Curated annotation (Swiss-Prot):
InterPro entries: Ribosomal_bL32, Ribosomal_bL32_bact, Ribosomal_zn-bd. The keyword Magnesium does not apply. NCBIfam families: rpmF_bact. PANTHER family: 50S RIBOSOMAL PROTEIN L32, LARGE RIBOSOMAL SUBUNIT PROTEIN BL32. Belongs to the bacterial ribosomal protein bL32 family. It comes from the Bacteria. GO terms for molecular function: structural constituent of ribosome. Disulfide bonds: none annotated. It comes from Limosilactobacillus reuteri (strain DSM 20016). GO terms for cellular component: large ribosomal subunit. This is Large ribosomal subunit protein bL32. Keywords: Ribonucleoprotein, Ribosomal protein. Transmembrane segments: none annotated. HAMAP family: Ribosomal_bL32.
Length: 59
C-alpha cells in the first residue's frame, strides 16, 4: 500500500485547506421595515414578501 514518506507539516496542511471557510449568508434589508433578512425569503419581523403581507405577525 502507498504510505506517505514524510509527516505532513501544519503549514502544508493549512495551506492546502486555506480555501475551506464558512460562507456569510446573503442578507439584504427589508424594503418594508428595514430589518436584515435572507434574500428571496419572507421577512421574519414584518411578514412581508414582494410588497405583500404573507405571514401575519402580531407586533
Amino acid at each position: 500500500m502507498a504510505v506517505p514518506a514524510r509527516k505532513t507539516s501544519k503549514t502544508k496542511k493549512r495551506m492546502r485547506r486555506g480555501h475551506i471557510k464558512l460562507n456569510v449568508p446573503g442578507l439584504t434589508p427589508c424594503p418594508n421595515c428595514g430589518e436584515l433578512r435572507k434574500s428571496h425569503m419572507v421577512c421574519p419581523s414584518c411578514g412581508y414578501y414582494d410588497g405583500k403581507q404573507v405571514v401575519n405577525t402580531n407586533n
